[in-house]
UniProtKB/Swiss-Prot annotation:
Protein EC: 2.3.2.27
Primary location class: nucleus
Ranges where the FHA domain occurs: 31-82
Protein name as it appears in the record: E3 ubiquitin-protein ligase CHFR
UniProt organism field: Danio rerio
Gene behind this protein: chfr
Keyword Transferase: yes
A GO CC term assigned to this protein in UniProt: nucleus
Length: 637
């Protein structure tokens, strides 16, 4: 801040629902607000405030004041939201919400902007000088020896109140309490440096920027033990705080005094944000990454989340695997070596270790896919042993299923399937497939046991292994472990798929469990033709199951012909291939409905040139105007 900028104040921000003396005087031509520590008005402990939330700019020529939003959540001015990269002309009396929560008013951070005329600014400076002079006289009587000033940073507020913002010392002034009260509190806390805290610029002989600093003391009448606890917490968050109290005569670099220091602080903040867990909002500890999205969290934090949801906390992508992120763990360790004050306490570390429910078995690689068109090879599951010594038994199979000797259930359960849900699903579907394998906890004998080094398949739905028994069926293409069309393996027919939400990933075509929405957009996304078919079925008390059975009967009689001649009513199809074949049969069924059984509005439409291949039939107007249950008649190769 130059001397020219500091000649007079042009505005001030008064905090809503605060003490009458709590105000922020704006002097610089540009004032920044955000969570970063180098902002003029900083809220470092409030995660609802963006790093660079907004900036308030004063035009010295026109005298106008503008607020430009740079945040993610936006800024609310007079109950009107200003989003990112938008500007708003501030008027005297405008209420600015840096944080606005309609259902959580205690989280709101609101200030009232008040413009200051040059006359008011001059009188304000005279009043400040009077306060400083009175403070100098009082401190001279009690402490004649000059002491270097010490900055006392604000202590965090207790309860649910908003954290008091820390401000840039070169642009903003706080008047939170009478100076006499500040002197009493400082003398009680630290008698050596009490006079320097409240004395202001009378004892400082430095640059003009230093001369205009007004040190502020903060207190809320709490007991000594509570104040000391909060001070220790502040020491961990800010390395400069502890050093300022330990040595009152140490030189304290002012923020903004050197451009290099400001750049280094911004870089440090960026690194800290990159190494912060979004769940606990602290530096990562024993971090893990979820796949396939690769977002990273503390192991203890994600353990609690994993019990409630199977989706990623950041992007809501389904989590398939969990892995240790060794690179980020090393980066966090290196960062803490340079910033030891940011380390967690021993109690926090012990608590996080106790809450960590991610076992070593969950971190082992579960699936390694290997697709080959030349070989009829399957997917392989690698079960890595905890013992890395040379005496480990290399003759063990790379994967284990329920029918392998030595199978243990807890080593094979999918990461996103709860143990109780899996047990319930296995018990319910124990007799669905040809295998009579039961839960590993029961003593019932099993008909099939995997031989050593047996080949296994990985279910496409639940990603769990099962024995490869395709060649026990002749021909192997009709195996109940594969879809006839896509040839992908599924375990539902074999022993029941345990994935939550699976209603039959593989079944005979006649027994396929399609839901009631299978008729929506059944004709290449043509909603109008789909509604015509649904109305026709509902008027006759029929559902999609009746349509499927009638179509399969016509297929068996040779009335219908599918593009894949291999498909019959007894063919094993996965859900996707079965739905695609069902839509093909639905078109055949709709095509054979007599026009006399359909409304006149349907039968009186002309045929579209493109017929069933029309790409415009998804538009409602075009679908209503033309009939698309016909073959293409123009531009046909």
């Amino acid at each position: 801040m130059t001397n020219q900028d500091s000649d007079q104040a042009w505005g001030k921000l008064v905090k809503v629902d605060a003490s009458p003396g709590s105000e922020i005087v704006l002097i610089n031509s540009e004032c920044t607000v955000g969570r970063k520590k180098d902002c003029d008005l900083s809220f470092p402990a409030n995660k609802l405030v963006s790093g660079n939330h907004c900036k308030i700019t004063h035009d010295q020529n026109s005298g106008k004041v503008w607020l430009e939003d740079m945040s993610t959540n936006g800024t609310v001015i007079n109950m009107s939201k200003v989003v990112k990269k938008q500007t708003h002309l501030l008027q005297n009396g405008d209420v600015i919400y840096f944080v606005y929560r309609k259902n959580e008013p205690e989280q709101n951070i609101a200030y009232v902007y008040q413009s200051i005329t040059p006359q008011e600014s001059a009188s304000h400076d005279v009043e400040d000088a009077g306060r400083e002079e009175d403070s100098d006289l009082t401190e001279t009587e009690s402490e004649p020896a000059p002491v270097e000033p010490v900055i006392v940073k604000p202590l965090p507020q207790s309860g649910h109140e908003d954290p008091q913002p820390s401000t840039s010392s070169s642009s903003l002034h706080f008047y939170n309490m009478p100076l006499s009260t500040c002197s009493d509190v400082s003398a009680r806390k630290n008698p050596v440096s009490s006079s320097a805290v409240c004395k202001g610029d009378s004892t400082s002989s430095g640059s003009p920027a230093q001369t205009r600093l007004k040190w502020t003391c903060w207190t809320d009448g709490e007991p000594e033990e509570e104040m000391q606890r909060k001070r220790r917490k502040t020491d961990r968050d800010d390395p400069g705080f502890g050093s300022a109290h330990s040595d009152a005569s140490a030189d304290i670099p002012l923020r903004g005094a050197s451009g290099k220091e400001k750049t280094e602080g911004a870089t440090t903040d960026k690194m800290e944000e990159s190494l912060t867990c979004i769940i606990c909002q602290d530096l990562l500890y024993d971090c893990i990454s979820v796949q396939p999205c690769m977002h990273t969290f503390c192991a203890a934090c994600y353990s609690g989340w994993m019990e409630r949801s199977s989706f990623c906390p950041t992007c809501r992508c389904p989590v398939e695997r969990i892995r240790k992120n060794h690179i980020l763990n090393n980066l966090v360790e290196a960062y803490l070596l340079q910033h030891p004050e940011k380390c967690r306490t021993e109690d926090d570390l012990r608590s996080m270790d106790a809450r960590n429910k991610i076992t070593q078995d969950m971190l082992q690689p579960k699936v390694e896919r290997s697709f080959s068109d030349e070989e009829a090879s399957s997917d392989y599951l690698f079960e890595l042993s905890d013992n890395d010594s040379d005496i480990s038994d290399m003759s063990q199979p790379y994967m284990m299923c329920r029918q392998c000797p030595g199978y243990r259930k807890e080593l094979s359960s999918a990461l996103w399937i709860c143990e109780s849900a899996q047990s319930e699903s296995l018990a319910k579907t124990a007799g669905d497939g040809p295998s009579t394998s039961s839960d590993s906890t029961t003593a019932a004998p099993q008909e099939f046991r995997c031989p050593p080094q047996a080949s296994h398949l990985i279910c496409t739905c639940c990603l769990q292994p099962m024995p490869d028994r395709r060649f026990e069926h002749l021909p192997p293409q009709v195996s109940p472990q594969h879809c006839l069309v896509c040839q992908k393996p599924f375990c539902h027919v074999y022993w029941g798929c345990p994935r939550i939400g699976c209603h039959g990933c593989l079944a005979r075509f006649s027994e396929l469990n399609l839901n009631d929405k299978c008729l929506d957009g059944v004709f290449n996304g043509n909603q109008y033709e789909s509604e015509v078919l649904q109305n026709y079925l509902s008027c006759r008390g029929m559902s999609w199951r009746h349509l499927l059975q009638d179509s399969l009967q016509a297929l068996q009689q040779g009335l219908y012909h599918l593009s894949d001649y291999r498909i019959t009513a007894n063919s094993f199809l996965c859900y996707c291939c079965g739905l695609r074949t069902f839509r093909e049969l639905a078109y055949k069924y709709r095509e054979r409905i007599p026009p006399s059984e359909l409304p006149d509005a349907v039968t009186n439409r002309p045929n579209c040139y493109w017929g069933r291949n029309c790409r415009t039939q998804v538009k409602a107007h075009h679908a209503l105007k033309f009939n698309h249950i016909c073959e293409q008649t123009r531009f046909k190769n």
